Design a protein with these regions (language model features):
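Regulatory input/activation interfaces that engage signals or partners
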Residues: 4-20, 24-148, 152, 156, ...
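Signal-transducing coiled-coil/dimerization helices and immediately adjacent hinge/linker segments
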Residues: 170-189
Length: 189
């Protein structure tokens, strides 16, 4: 066997053994999601229970100020502003272009008006990520095309909410910045 081939295999397997950070792993997950749920920009936020805040773990395609507004301002009063679907019986994630344009709707919020729309994002969805019933974070997806997140894409997005929540849960200690020496305790009063 050629010595160069063995060395090449060795490098390939040794590189694969180097663990990815949670951010790198989530970036890979987002790129995988993009194949079935296209987006111009996306962001995954983890809910840090120890500080009662959302923290961005990865974002792709958003200008820095838009990503900051989504991570900090948008999550401050989550789940407000409430999104108002056109069809009240539709339990899929609501898209920006698929919601009613009424007072209090997301399209009239300062997040959309001051950040997303000026950056050219005309449609988007937010997925609430839950693992085993526990809220673990949010995933934001945006498109520059009005009406992009139609019913079929929203249906696909619902499946990815579960997978992204699982990925967050698998890395919870690192993502929530919980010290490895921390232990849970149950207090009964």
């Amino acid at each position: 066997m050629d010595h160069a081939v063995v060395r090449s295999w060795s490098r390939e397997f040794s590189d694969a053994a180097i663990p990815l950070t949670s951010s790198q792993l989530m970036r890979q997950h987002l790129e995988g999601v993009r194949l079935a749920l296209p987006f111009d920009a996306a962001q995954v936020l983890v809910f840090d229970r120890s500080k009662d805040v959302h923290r961005q773990i990865v974002q792709v395609g958003y200008p820095a100020e838009v990503a900051r507004a989504l991570a900090e301002d948008f999550t401050q009063n989550w789940p407000s502003p409430v999104w108002y679907p056109v069809d009240a019986d539709d339990d899929l994630p609501t898209s920006i272009s698929g919601e009613r344009d009424v007072d209090g709707s997301f399209r009239r919020s300062h997040i959309y008006r001051d950040y997303l729309a000026p950056a050219g994002f005309l449609d988007g969805i937010t997925l609430e990520l839950k693992h085993r019933g526990r809220y673990v974070g949010l995933a934001n997806f945006s498109s520059r095309t009005l009406g992009f997140y139609d019913r079929s894409r929203r249906l696909v997005s619902a499946a990815f909410a579960t997978l992204l929540a699982q990925a967050i849960s698998d890395n919870a200690r690192e993502l929530e910045a919980i010290p490895p020496t921390a232990h849970a305790a149950r207090v009964i009063r």
